[in-house]
């Protein structure tokens, strides 16, 4: 749980950097297997934004930053710029979680600073790895990110890599060439669909022309009687 909780703080920071400081927490779930983070944002994130957030969190993990837990007065924490959850009720004494940019950081060198009573790691490197599983809508104006860390991230990467290798085997190509092979197959399917549509049109016209040969004139009126299958 500590791994996913500390990763949640890093994710919150990354969303502020990539989207805006209005991407504030609107709910979260921290479990031993994964994390879920809801935040305010009017539209879905682009694949590029998701990639940037994921990269930023992993860079913070690799930076091996210290995570400091301190209990202090609510007024003091607010004066220092600690981030508080909107609508949350706090007592006069609160617990703060600071992720420092280095072991020698001062108050002004905090990478992340939030009010939080949960359990956390001692250093960001203990997160191990961070991988976003999905990003989608949780409610109107609220987005949701689900992610895994540590062993969970490793296992998901292994699962996806296995799928990629199986796909490469089916396509009879190398792992690096899978995207190009898929693009080529999509182009081929698109062309085949066009050819099929053209053949259907030609067949329909040919059938119609054959039927015209059976037109009979009844009292100066051209009549065509035919049985149409289906």
Describe the residue ranges of each PLM region.
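Short hinge/gating elements
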Residues: 1, 39-40, 110, 169, ...
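Composition- and surface-driven signal marking solvent-exposed, interaction-prone regions
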Residues: 3-7, 27, 50-54, 114-117, ...
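Active/ligand-binding-proximal structured segments within catalytic/core domains
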Residues: 1-39
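Secondary-structure capping and boundary motifs in well-ordered enzyme cores
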Residues: 2-3, 7, 45, 137, ...
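Non-catalytic interaction/regulatory segments
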Residues: 39-138
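Terminal appendage regions of diverse proteins
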Residues: 22-24, 32, 124-230
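Feature representing long, continuous alpha-helical segments
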Residues: 5-8, 13, 17, 51, ...
